[in-house]
Amino acid sequence: MEEHYYVSIDIGSSSVKTIVGEKFHNGINVIGTGQTYTSGIKNGLIDDFDIARQAIKDTIKKASIASGVDIKDVFLKLPIIGTEVYDESNEIEFYEDTEIDGTHIESVLEGIRDKNDVPETEVINVFPIRFVVDKDNEVSDPKELIARHSLKVDAGVIAIQKSILINMIKCVEACGVDVLDVYSDAYNYGSILTPTEKELGACVIDIGEDLTQVAFYERGELVDAESIEMAGRDITDDIAQGLNTTYDTAEKVKHQYGHAFYDSASDQDVFSVDQVDSDEHVQYTQKDLSDFIEQRVEDIFFEVFDVLQELGLTKVNGGFVVTGGSANLLGVKELLQDMVSEKVRIHTPSQMGIRKPEFSSAISTISSSIAFDELLDYVTISYQDNEEFEEEVIESDKDSETKSSGFDWFKRKSNKKENDEVAPEAPREESYEDRENHLEDEQQTEGKAKEESKFKKLMKSLFE
């Protein structure tokens, strides 16, 4: 069977992560990962281009080796920095009865990008909230419906500062891969929430190394998002200062003995640390350590509450979902639960090989990619083994000894319907295999042009 892969890159402040995954029934099967720690990123942005580029290149190589996939194309996640979230509508008209397909959906969504009037920003994600066919038929997915007059979309829009977008893409593509599309964490976090949480109103709190990102969802859709420049590094700084030790020692102690909820911390777990101004070793307990950690984590949560108030959000009926690298700390859930009356949970990805909160953003980027590919008819995946089914898209590739990235294939699939309509009927004397090879080549060329043109159009607009 021809494998179809998605590759995501998460450029975080402490490390760069790459995941190679494939759609599997209702979830994602992770087949390879890479992670490289780096000092080239600060507050989620490129701080040292060369160091960051090398880290990205290394993690792509690790993921490629682990998965056996020749990685050529990637989906890039972007942090919630310099980000605007707002609603917009657009409508396209039809002058005859038209069966709606992915190209019409893409057209009505792309029209929203052109309406962006926020200076020095670029629209990176447009996600449909509802579609309206012929003025009064409200639907969630209009594909295959007949429209006589119009297709309208009410959508959420995420825009980011152009300079952030340009530099992120430039750094990734300097590693020899192409960025197929970008997805903001503001949108990605929707995939880690349950339908009930998204409907009632839930707040995602991603505590990373330099940034704590906050996204609020209600009635199934993203409402707003913001970031706070206070996170795991501040916790480590407090420990280093409180224990009078080095940052590196404080980081090790945090991971080995850290506890964010003082009441649950142990006074039996004892450890010793070197002092920065002497040769002596001083002993501390987990409870001593927790005193510093709890105060800083509490401050982070208070900052989150302030953000929610500034956004005009006073109720979080769906609860709080905490993720990110610092969610690994013991006691984080208990501390937040002690501060709020709503439900609190820690989110950890369920896939084998990435069962750590710090991988939430990277795997969510793949979820976002799959969702848009299916919405726009770029891919259609089912699980029938019979070749007679049009939607069976994972096909045998017995001649290939190495795995391809899969992106060439799904770019072909994006134009399959269009090619089927316009391609002339093959002569009867032409073999079935010849026809298949000819059609595949044609689809690959046209599909690739379509996918690339979408992103090239975006990149061109950045430099205008």
Curated annotation (Swiss-Prot):
GO terms for biological process: FtsZ-dependent cytokinesis. Keywords: Cell cycle, Cell division, Cell membrane, Membrane. Pfam families: FtsA, SHS2_FTSA. InterPro entries: ATPase_NBD, Cell_div_FtsA, FtsA/MreB, SHS2_FtsA. Signal peptide: none annotated. The keyword Iron-sulfur does not apply. Gene3D superfamilies: 3.30.1490.110, 3.30.420.40. Its main location: membrane. Residues 392-464 are annotated as: Disordered. Self-interacts. Interacts with FtsZ. This is Cell division protein FtsA. It comes from Staphylococcus epidermidis (strain ATCC 35984 / DSM 28319 / BCRC 17069 / CCUG 31568 / BM 3577 / RP62A).
